[in-house]
């Protein structure tokens, strides 16, 4: 990326930055949202995580050395926000046993894909170990390679392969039991 474009990206409110963020949003929002839904089991919480990631990208744009790394930054930001959300939920459930009411409004995506199937898969995914769920979400929702998944989660490629294998095996067993 040219030095002039990089300088434009870092400026406060330039058309280049606004266009860059708009392009990132259009290209990656859906995949990031799917990642969040798989990790959290809640579309609303996933939307918040993705929105927060884009806000953080805007807020920290001056420290982003390479705008080409923005996609990886967004993935990591969404994943970290999902982890934080899960930790908060565990803490809240442990300290106050209240049921969280989910918003059951159907989105056009839910209707198209088959809301029941999506909810069933998300429910089964939520029973997996956290790391298995993260790896499977990266590999099959975001369609990242083993290397990209390892970099995003900051684990070895061998760990990605092992968690993928174990996670898929567990998913298959749980789905067979559910049928």
Regions found by a protein language model. Name each.
Residues 79, 83, 153-179:
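DNA-recognition helix of helix-turn-helix
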Residues 2-12, 20, 93-96, 114-115, ...:
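C-terminal edge and immediately downstream basic/flexible tail or linker adjoining helix-turn-helix-like DNA-binding
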Residues 19, 23, 101-126:
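Acidic, proline/glycine-rich intrinsically disordered inter-domain spacer in sigma factors
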Residues 123-126, 130-134, 142-159:
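Helix-turn-helix DNA-binding module
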Residues 1-31, 38, 118, 123:
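N-terminal module of bacterial RNA polymerase sigma factors
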Residues 48-55, 68-80:
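Structural recognition of an alpha-helix C-terminal capping motif at a helix-to-coil junction
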Residues 12-23, 33-52, 62-68, 157, ...:
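Short, charged helix-capping/linker segments at alpha-helix termini
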Residues 59-65, 76-97, 106, 114:
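Arg/Lys-rich amphipathic alpha helix in sigma70-family domain 2
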């Amino acid at each position: 990326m040219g030095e002039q474009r990089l300088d434009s990206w870092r400026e406060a409110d330039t058309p280049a930055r606004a266009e860059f963020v708009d392009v990132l949003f259009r290209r990656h929002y859906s995949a990031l949202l799917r990642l969040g839904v798989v990790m959290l089991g809640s579309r609303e919480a996933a939307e918040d995580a993705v929105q927060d990631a884009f806000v953080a990208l805007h807020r920290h744009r001056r420290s982003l050395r390479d705008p080409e790394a923005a996609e990886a930054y967004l993935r990591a930001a969404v994943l970290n926000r999902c982890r934080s959300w899960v930790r908060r939920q565990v803490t809240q459930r442990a300290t106050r046993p209240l049921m969280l009411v989910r918003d059951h409004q159907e989105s056009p995506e839910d209707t198209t894909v088959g809301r029941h199937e999506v909810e069933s898969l998300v429910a089964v995914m939520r029973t997996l170990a956290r790391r298995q769920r993260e790896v499977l979400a990266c590999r099959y929702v975001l369609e990242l390679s083993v290397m990209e998944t390892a970099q995003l989660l900051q684990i070895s490629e061998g760990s990605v392969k092992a968690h993928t294998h174990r996670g898929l095996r567990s998913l298959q067993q749980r789905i067979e039991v559910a049928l």
